[in-house]
């Protein structure tokens, strides 16, 4: 595995790889890699000749009161995970390398961002889209891999890639969970022992809602209220949202049918966790 720290070197490498006809699987991350990231890397390894991993904590996608400085970082650990999962090139640029001068252009996302996390984090998805535009131009991937834990992000990226005719295939990968059901996340390290137990109820609430839908409930308000009530009863966390939308358009539905997403965000003392399920309802 080779570690690359400059845009120029990474572009030269990927340009030569694509010229030689090799497919490139790209996994963009903010580091502090866990089994969810490893799953993305293994999927990329299976489907491509070359695997490129980027580790970059992107300041553009953090708001003024968010956890940019607290976001966990451990490049030695990330290097080990990368090596264990078949990464060929680890792209690890500094903020100064990615944004060497005042940014004159950003990508504004006008759909799919006014709900769920986008509603709580104005400017977040503009930051995501901007850094991905740069990373796609730098790594020139054949395929790019994203976890469905950030399902809104996946929907935004798919739209952005289509709108700008970017020649990359977006590959969504199912949420990776701990054995007890908690969605793996770099932010889980902020949970206290009691909160770690309570956090299990996020996924349980989604499973209960799914069972209710499968039993025939089609009223979205009944489903979302069920989730909110369950979480408020079983945890000390604060429900940021528990919402149901069509997916990937993220538009309101009057009836639970077609492909939908049921998504939740819950604030504990030191961390905000998200989770979701997507399903197709006939």
UniProtKB/Swiss-Prot annotation:
It holds the Pfam family Pantoate_ligase. InterPro entries: Cyt_trans-like, Pantoate_ligase, Pantoate_ligase_C, Rossmann-like_a/b/a_fold. Catalyzes the condensation of pantoate with beta-alanine in an ATP-dependent reaction via a pantoyl-adenylate intermediate. It catalyses: (R)-pantoate + beta-alanine + ATP = (R)-pantothenate + AMP + diphosphate + H(+). It comes from Bacillus cereus (strain ATCC 14579 / DSM 31 / CCUG 7414 / JCM 2152 / NBRC 15305 / NCIMB 9373 / NCTC 2599 / NRRL B-3711). Keywords: ATP-binding, Cytoplasm, Ligase, Nucleotide-binding, Pantothenate biosynthesis. GO terms for biological process: pantothenate biosynthetic process. Pathway: Cofactor biosynthesis; (R)-pantothenate biosynthesis; (R)-pantothenate from (R)-pantoate and beta-alanine: step 1/1. Its main location: cytoplasm. One of its GO terms (cellular component) is cytosol. Signal peptide: none annotated. It is found in: Cytoplasm. The keyword ATP-binding applies. (R)-pantoate binds at residues 61, 153. It comes from the Bacteria. It is an enzyme of class 6 (ligase). Beta-alanine binds at residue 61. Its EC number is 6.3.2.1. This is Pantothenate synthetase.
């Amino acid at each position: 595995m080779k570690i690359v720290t400059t845009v120029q070197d990474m572009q030269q490498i990927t340009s030569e790889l694509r010229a030689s006809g090799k497919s490139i699987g790209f996994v963009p991350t903010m580091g502090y890699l866990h089994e969810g990231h490893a799953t993305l890397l293994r999927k990329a390894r299976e489907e491509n000749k070359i695997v490129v991993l980027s580790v970059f904590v992107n300041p553009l996608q953090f708001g003024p009161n968010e956890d940019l400085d607290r976001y966990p970082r451990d490049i030695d650990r990330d290097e080990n995970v990368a090596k264990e999962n078949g990464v060929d090139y680890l792209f690890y640029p500094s903020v100064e390398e990615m944004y060497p001068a005042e940014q004159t252009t950003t990508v504004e996302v006008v759909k799919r961002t006014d709900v769920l996390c986008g509603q709580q984090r104005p400017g977040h998805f503009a930051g995501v889209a901007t850094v991905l535009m740069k990373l796609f131009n730098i790594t020139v991937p054949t395929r790019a891999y994203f976890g469905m834990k950030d399902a809104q992000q996946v929907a935004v990226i798919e739209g952005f890639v289509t709108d700008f005719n970017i020649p990359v295939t977006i590959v969504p990968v199912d949420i990776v969970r701990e054995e007890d059901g908690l969605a793996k996340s770099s932010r889980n390290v902020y949970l206290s022992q009691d909160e770690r137990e309570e956090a299990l109820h996020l996924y349980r609430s989604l499973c209960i809602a799914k069972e209710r839908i499968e039993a025939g409930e089609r009223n979205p308000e009944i489903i979302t209220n069920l989730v909110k009530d369950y979480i408020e009863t079983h945890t000390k966390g604060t429900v940021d949202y528990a919402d149901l939308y069509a997916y990937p358009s993220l538009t309101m539905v009057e009836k639970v049918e077609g492909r939908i997403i049921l998504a939740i965000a819950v604030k504990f003392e030191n961390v905000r966790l998200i989770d979701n399920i997507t399903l197709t309802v006939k």
